[in-house]
A protein has these predicted regions:
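Short, surface-exposed basic-aromatic patches at helix termini and helix-loop junctions that form
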Residues: 10, 63-69, 122, 143-152
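Short, solvent-exposed loop/turn and secondary-structure capping segments
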Residues: 27, 57-62, 84-88, 97, ...
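Alpha/beta-hydrolase
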Residues: 133, 142-235
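Alpha/beta-hydrolase active-site loop
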Residues: 100-123
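Conserved alpha/beta-hydrolase
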Residues: 66-88
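Catalytic-loop region of hydrolases
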Residues: 1-72
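Alpha/beta-hydrolase active-site loop signature
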Residues: 53, 79-82, 161
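Alpha/beta-hydrolase fold nucleophile elbow
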Residues: 124-134
């Protein structure tokens, strides 16, 4: 464990040993990163179910539910993200392309959270709240579906249940319903101009990436296209 300094009086970075596959312990284990924010052993516990990499180490990290209800908080990094990637922890030669992704399942992620819940319930006696945002909201829903007795209340912030890798519902919604017709026209014109002026704008885009130490696993042109095409969704 590692003690961290920030908004909370007591904050710790922990690694919880988890089965790679909760239905087949013989496959071995990996270490899952967990950030514990301690207030008091009798206060409620907020379990933040991340959908991706943990952000809890940031010195200003907080959560509005934790503030509203004066809770302790556990932020759990999702398996296969950040420092919580099975197999890679033991073999530095493994890449995203060669990694075995078979155990990245809703059941396993829910079982990870269940195990963490059971461990910390031995210490904290208050009520438990589960929450997450976006894919973290999905994680909250999956977790409380598989283990409803773990949690007293779940509050997912946005919980998109996608039909597949390409859902198909977002594009017509953004094109026809989101915002006002004037808003949609302004955003469309903005996108067209950025694509037309790619050669002039791209150097500024590259400079911004370098200044913020941003690196990408795909070509810069593809990153540029993603930023332009997804701007209405982010807006």
């Amino acid at each position: 464990e590692e003690r961290l300094e920030d908004l909370y009086a007591d904050k710790y970075k922990l690694f919880i040993e988890q089965p790679i596959d909760h239905t087949n312990p013989s496959l071995g284990t990996f270490k899952q990163k967990v950030i514990l924010f301690h207030v008091d052993y009798i206060n409620p516990m907020l379990l933040v179910t991340e959908g991706y990499t943990s952000n809890g180490e940031h010195p200003r990290y907080s959560n509005e539910l934790s503030t509203l209800f004066e809770t302790n908080m556990i932020e759990v990094e999702h398996r296969y993200f950040g420092e919580s990637v099975p197999f890679m922890q033991d073999d530095s030669t493994i890449t995203d392309e060669t990694l075995n992704w078979d155990y990245m399942t809703a059941k396993n992620e829910a079982a990870d959270l269940h195990r963490i819940n059971q461990l910390f319930k031995k210490i904290y006696s208050g009520k438990w709240i589960a929450t997450g945002i976006s894919k973290g909201g999905q994680t909250t829903m999956f977790y409380t579906t598989y283990y409803p007795e773990d949690i007293d209340i779940s509050i997912p912030y946005v919980g998109p249940l996608c039909k597949g890798q390409e859902d198909g519902r977002h594009e017509p919604f953004l094109a026809e319903f989101a915002g006002t017709p004037q808003d949609r026209k302004i955003l469309y014109n903005f996108q067209v101009e950025f694509l037309k002026r790619r050669e002039a704008i791209r150097p500024m885009f590259e400079e911004l990436s370098a200044r913020n130490n941003l690196t990408y696993k795909i070509p810069m042109d593809a990153v540029y296209d993603y930023c332009v095409l997804e701007f209405p969704f982010a807006f």
